[in-house]
Amino acid sequence: MLSSIADGKSTIRNLNDGADLQSTINALKACGAKIDSRNQTITIEGVDLTNPNEKLDCGNSGTTTRLISGLLSSQKLDFTLVGDSSLSSRPMKRIIIPLQEMGCEISSNDNLLPLTIDAKEGIQSIDLSLIHI
């Protein structure tokens, strides 16, 4: 994920090409990332990510959902995250609250997916205690 916003080109070898990785790749590509994936090797060219024209389908990947929400928010993007029925039943409060405190506007289905996150105004640092989430 970080390679998608880093300067230059990154190559990662010996990746397990599972469904979670594919969900991440598809979401990043929808935001303009330049990613080539073949034979357990992925090449990512860092770019300025852009607002996607579609909802970002995280499949069943909670990791994709949680990490990409922070990454894209840091890029001042406006996006919607969706997932399969299993992921859509998992509470997202532990990412909603910190992102809201950082300045994102978020709408959700009672703290469940889909999440629409508007971070166009940017995010600020916060002091957060994870015990309360």
Q: Which residues are covered by each model-predicted region?
A:
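Structural preference for solvent-exposed beta-strand-turn elements
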Residues: M1-I131
